[in-house]
A protein has these predicted regions:
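Structured soluble/peripheral alpha/beta segments that form catalytic or ligand/cofactor-binding pockets
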Residues: 1-268
């Protein structure tokens, strides 16, 4: 949860084994739960509830577009070799309203959300040290997902990829050569991990006439303090401005960066 007005960032994570009162899923009842966190889809949309000692979320969600299945033929290849891939599904534009409780106050909110679900079958290659992932909602009702995988020598991995979603929900798979993600000189140094993250980017997708700049309204959105074996993430809100063809365009999004403190060892 990013509180832009007060410059605060909140993160909560919970791991439970399956069992009564712990965690589970019931397709028959249309419900997923993890303690008192839950998603309920019996109403046709989704109802999301999550409570932490610092904040509480209660949202009603309804997807405006069909799910997107990334990759080619439903497989998002991440590296050379059998099994080095994922299945990756997104709901890229979800009408959302509800309440956020923070600091003893309740706020009514509405907006547009995004949901991702990705599961891997194997680890990355040793030469792949991290990634930069962008999810972007543009004002013309299109969405853009771009993944830049970084290699140890500083080059961009050929398995970098993306997806463009048009206003009607049609999707186009993008290969590494179809787009450019270029970090600019603005860096934020984390006091927790000492990692230096690029917090301004240039984004180019010539195939769709898209030229954007992305920057974050809140530099401190790093997720640390998990297992020592887990990657450290910078994961937070970004604002977008630029052009699509001859028209100016704006948008919002989310940026995830890993491997800036040490090489990621996902799956090893």
């Amino acid at each position: 949860l990013s509180d832009l007005d007060n410059g605060a960032f909140y993160h909560a994570e919970r791991v439970n084994r399956a069992g009564p009162g712990l965690a589970g899923i019931s397709e028959a009842n249309g419900r997923i739960w993890n303690g008192n966190w839950s998603v309920d889809w019996r109403s046709g949309g989704q109802t999301l509830r999550a409570t932490d000692e610092r904040f509480e979320l209660n949202f009603a969600l309804h997807s405006e577009k069909a799910p997107i299945v990334h990759g080619e033929n439903g497989v998002s290849q991440k590296a050379a070799g059998a099994g080095r891939a994922s299945h990756y599904i997104s709901l890229t534009r979800i009408a959302t309203n509800g309440q956020i409780e923070l600091g003893g106050k309740s706020f009514d909110v509405s907006g547009t959300a995004w949901m991702d679900h990705e599961f891997f079958t194997h680890q990355l290659e040793a030469e792949q040290v991290g990634w930069d992932w962008f999810s972007m909602q543009l004002a013309d009702k299109t969405e853009l997902i771009l993944l830049r995988i970084r290699r140890k020598d500083g080059s961009v991995d050929p398995y970098s990829a993306g997806t463009f979603v048009d206003a009607n929900g049609g999707q186009t798979h993008l290969r590494a050569g179809d787009f450019t993600l270029q970090p600019m000189d603005d860096l934020w140094k984390s006091p927790a991990s000492n990692a230096r993250y690029p917090i301004r980017w240039k984004i180019s997708v010539p195939r769709f006439g898209i030229e954007l700049e992305a920057e974050t309204p809140l530099a401190s959105q790093e997720i640390t303090g998990r297992s020592k074996l887990a990657p450290i993430y910078w994961e937070g809100a970004i604002a977008l401005a630029g052009r699509r063809g001859d028209s100016s365009i704006a948008g919002v999004g989310y940026l995830e960066m890993t491997g800036y403190d040490r090489p990621v060892e996902l799956g090893h």
